[in-house]
Amino acid sequence: MELEFKKIKAITKIAKETKVVNFSVKKNENYFANGVLTHNCYMKRHKPEGLSVATNTMDILTEINSHAYFSTVEKPNQTGEYITYDISCNEDFALHAKYHDWKTIFGFFRDHPLAMGSFATKYVNADFFDFNPEGKIRVRFSLMPEKWRKILEPNTSSLDLRLNAVPRFIDAGYEVHLNFSPVIVHDNWLTEYEFLFHLINRHSHFNNWNNDAVKAEVIFLTHNEQKHLYNLEHKLPGEELLWVPKIQETKTSQYGGKNIRYEHNRKADYIKQWTKLHDEHIPWNTIRYIF
């Protein structure tokens, strides 16, 4: 099967002015979101075509500054001493950095006494190596077995490129974590993750990673009915990995959409199996959270 990958040919400015909305979150939560739109990207549930890029950067940073000073967060939790803001929920910031004044954004968090920025990425942007955020930007490299990355994350950096970039980003002044997301359960999934863990260990050994600083976050797959139908309509490969109702259950998202996730009893067992395998091979990679 041949796939047609469309590249951005033009950016059209929308006449309607965008507005900054004051944001808030539930008690005890302190993450905020403003892609490479891969086959499993949740953003395509809401925006099937194209990509939205925020251009009112200074307005957004002003709101973040106000929130950081006047938020109800009483003390830091396990994530660190700063309030953490996700600066790239609706796109892959590293890939689309050319559409942003990224140095201003990174500089804002570098110099802010209370806040730090964070983003997950599937792309190695070498331009970032020339900027030292002094530990105030967290880069979370998304990882899955390479076999499935090629299918589900086309046109993104290979696992070798991502893993080779880890020590370079650390040396440049970034905090770096590994983002195992999404974890997809299928035949031989644990065998493939065992190989991935061996690959990570090999990179960490030969490239002299500061292993204590490289932590993990783990998110098992959640899929969406609208995205499922989109994938089928456009004949995107790999859908048989994502939509497996016999081992999944439905849930209604906060946006009102119909999602599916692994049935909760099965998922509890999957998490135990994955964690056991992870800790056997890369115990130094502390898991911050897994769900």
Language model features with spans:
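Autoprocessing domains of the Hint superfamily
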Residues: M1-N40
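Conserved radical SAM core fold
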Residues: E91-L95, V124-D127, V139-T156, P182-D187, ...
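Short, well-ordered coil/turn segments that N-cap beta-strands
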Residues: T79-I83, P113-G117, E134-I137, A172-V176, ...
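Auxiliary Fe-S-binding modules of radical SAM enzymes
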Residues: N201-F291
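A conserved active-site cap/scaffold subdomain adjacent to cofactor or substrate pockets
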Residues: V166-F180, D187
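Catalytic cores of alpha/beta
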Residues: N188-H203
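Glycine-rich S-adenosyl-L-methionine
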Residues: T156-F169
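Conserved Radical SAM active-site core
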Residues: Y42-R140
